[in-house]
């Protein structure tokens, strides 16, 4: 794992950037994991969106 140097006050910004990058990586790996038919993919996408909407 690489080390990042952050200036005081930029910790929050660096954390947000890390979370964004890690989420993109997770989505990419999940997307290429296996093939889903369009109907099932749509259902999964709606299910994941509802999970985030509930907060």
Swiss-Prot record:
Protein origin, superkingdom: Bacteria
Biological-process GO terms, alphabetical: translation
GO cellular component, one term: ribosome
GO molecular function: structural constituent of ribosome
Stored InterPro entries: Ribosomal_bS21
Keywords from the UniProt entry: Ribonucleoprotein, Ribosomal protein
Family per similarity comment: Belongs to the bacterial ribosomal protein bS21 family.
The protein's name: Small ribosomal subunit protein bS21
Organism: Ureaplasma parvum serovar 3 (strain ATCC 700970)
Phylogenetic placement of the source organism: Bacteria, Bacillati, Mycoplasmatota, Mycoplasmoidales, Mycoplasmoidaceae
Gene that encodes it: rpsU
């Amino acid at each position: 794992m690489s080390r990042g140097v952050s200036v005081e006050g930029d910790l929050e910004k660096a954390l947000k950037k890390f979370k964004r990058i890690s989420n993109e990586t997770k989505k990419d790996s999940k997307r290429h994991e296996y093939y889903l038919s369009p109907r099932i993919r749509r259902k999964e996408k709606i299910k994941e969106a509802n999970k985030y909407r509930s907060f």
